[in-house]
Amino acid sequence: MSDEVVTGMNGGTGSRRIGVYVCGCGGNISDYVSVDDVVAAVQDEPGVVVARTAMFTCSDATQQEIINDIQERNLDGIVVASCSPKLHTFTFREMSKRAGLNPYEYTQVNIREQCSWTHTDDRAGATGKAARLVRAGIARTGLTEPLEPVVVETIPKVVVIGGGIAGMRAALGLAEIGLAVFLVEKETELGGWVAGFAEMYPHGKDGRGLVTRLEEKIRRHPRITVFTDAEVVGKSGSFGNYEVNIRVGRERPEATVRETNSLETLTVEAGSIVVATGFDSYAPQAGEFGYGLDGVLTLPDFKRLVDSSDGPLSYHGTPVRTIVYVYCVGSRQPEGNEYCSRYCCTAAIHNSLQVTAKAAPAGAAPGAAAPRISQYHLYRDIRSYGKYEILYNESREKGGLYLRFPDDEAPVVAQASVGAKAGGGSASGAGHSHRLTVTTRDLLTGGAELIIPADLVVLVTGMVPRENDDLVKTLKLPVGNDGFFNEIHPKLRPVETVVDGVFICGACQGPKNSAEAVASGLAAVTQSASILKRGYAELDPLIAVVDPDACEWCGLCLEACPYEAPRRVEEGGEAVGDPRKAVAVIDRAACKGCGGCVPVCPKNAIDLLGYSDAQIRAMIDGLLQEVTPCRM
């Protein structure tokens, strides 16, 4: 932090004593915004006692200096002008607590995303805008009041939606911690995609066996109730006290149903919900990379073919000598899904090595020649990251040929002419007929055009989000542009959603391999159990409040609320002084403080704690004030 302490001219003689801290963010802000000029512009605002600059306000050293200011100068409010509140709101709230300041007397002002990163070509304009934003933050802080978290009791039960590997592991983890679990699976069997796998990398375990062992533990566990052929169709209540409606598609044995209203629709109580609905594999369109031609298979179809083979691979009774893999089908395509599916490069390489291994059966005599399998990998980029690069190196050592095609010139798959045979120089051997040809260009050989005869073409298909429209509406889940569920922050809060008590894990939040899916499932276990095991949860108090004297229930607030937080209370009674009056009451646990109900109220009966009408007006006044031009 800067050694200079700039004290406001008013010396903080008003009713508030506010500290202002302007961050340079290691040049991210200070290279485009004059942080010294920002301090100079706001130091004389009413209530400002101290105003400083800092290289990194989030650093431990600077936080300690702010704590010292709060304690030594008796500050009752602080403004931190730095980066996005999404990144450091909790950082500075916790810092405020350590200093003895109510955490809701702190205001974060975003001058990085909103100023320095936005106006890189206009230092004076960015500085002036930053000064106005900080002034607005000071105005808001001057009207803040100490708030306490909303405390709600929690039910020690969890609904896990999805019985794939992530959901199963999450359910077992929650039960082992001591929570009751309702595991809801849409299909008739548990296991998801992994239940159909044979050998898996890197542990070499059989996917079917892994799922079977996990299911046996789940079925035996007294705290887990399993509903297959079922889906969640309704939710009411709020974090810690949800009521979840489960529709069972067929009659269940009475022994498997607990806490039920009927055999068709069950209502269970739960403190939290874990969503692990998984993914679907990309389904190519007819004609896409030759899809629909005999011998063109998707990666899941090819894996089933390999897993079912006990020896050298054959297709429709014909030995397979040449396989061409086309990578990034359904991923990294501007006209389709632009994201990388992460797992498919490794999965394709692993399958190709299994093909090579099965070409030489374990019982073959030493030195016996194995049928030659030529395998061509046509790729944009190979992304077998981390330890999975071992597979890539092994594949190349065992003869796999990797050809990189241009982004704007994808391989062309066509049916081979009837009776077409490879020439004597073909890797598959003279006289061997091929079903298909693949034409591509290889950037690693100067863009040379290659025509590869093939017995099989494997389209290495990626992951796509599962169709979950009804579940999205039921749980109010946020969905990203890619169609997967959105977490709050991929690094800091990777399994939490904006809906309190609803967690996501596995491939429903984005492409993952099985190990990553299990890891995220266990992360959801940790987050859920850390709240439910203690019996209560603390929620943000920045929520809507209703003036019962002004309210005359019209229902507009309920229509505007995506979380159904406003509730109609009949005959207000003593709370409103009129037993015949109906008013709105906000469910404090359900409200997220979005403010959508405030402007629609015709009686102006709703206000938002932390962002009241008075605070918003004061912030607008601060934004409209002139600022001294930047010294550049």
Q: What are the roles of these predicted feature ranges?
A:
Residues 2-632:
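Residues forming the flavin
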